[in-house]
Amino acid sequence: MGTVVSFDVPARAGQPRGDGSLGRAVRWLHWVDATFSPYRDDSDVSRYGRGSLPLADCAPELAEVLEACAAISARSGGYFTTTPGGTFDPSGYVKGWAIERAAAILTAAGSAEHSVNGGGDVQCAGDRRWRIGIADPLHPGRLALVVAGRDFAVATSGVAERGAHIIDPYTGQSPAGLASITVVGARLAETDAYATAAFAMGSRARDWVEDLDGYEAFAVTAAGPTWQTSGFGRYRG
């Protein structure tokens, strides 16, 4: 998946310990990396992208991912794409989806409170008010803000962690309007993909996120000023 994943599972009464669920979540993430990594020549994603493995012979989860990606692409007017730069790569959806599923494994095992963090994109569960620091893309080492909430997901796209890596599919260039955008929602799979699409939109992102049901956003523009959608204030920590 090209990122480090960390787990926060507080030791509290009612939280299962030693049931093996954390190991299952880690094994799931390793399987996702082996199956979906575009950097591994033998992964299903790489073989499917080259045309050497038909979809029917791929892991069934790939068809699930492709269906979800098509829906998000339609909702975003094509700003979310599985072919950034012309090469098949569904990573813009897969990372959030994999982390969300890892959190679901813990929930299914009875873990009432936990968070799973993959490179700053986080799925949180439980009544605890989780606090997530968002890096300032223009001032390395500083935070732009702290996001706080319960039972929610947070995803950020921008230039802080990996530099300019998101492409506007209509221009083929890195978008210039935003330095970063943080999206908050219920489920990380969609939240992360929406953050990617919104960053690619640049100045169009604010109105688009405002129209999404159940999602809010905070952005740092490339020039420095920030903006947020109308309901984002309740997530400020």
Regions from the PLM with identified roles:
Residues 1-237:
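Mature catalytic core of soluble alpha/beta enzymes
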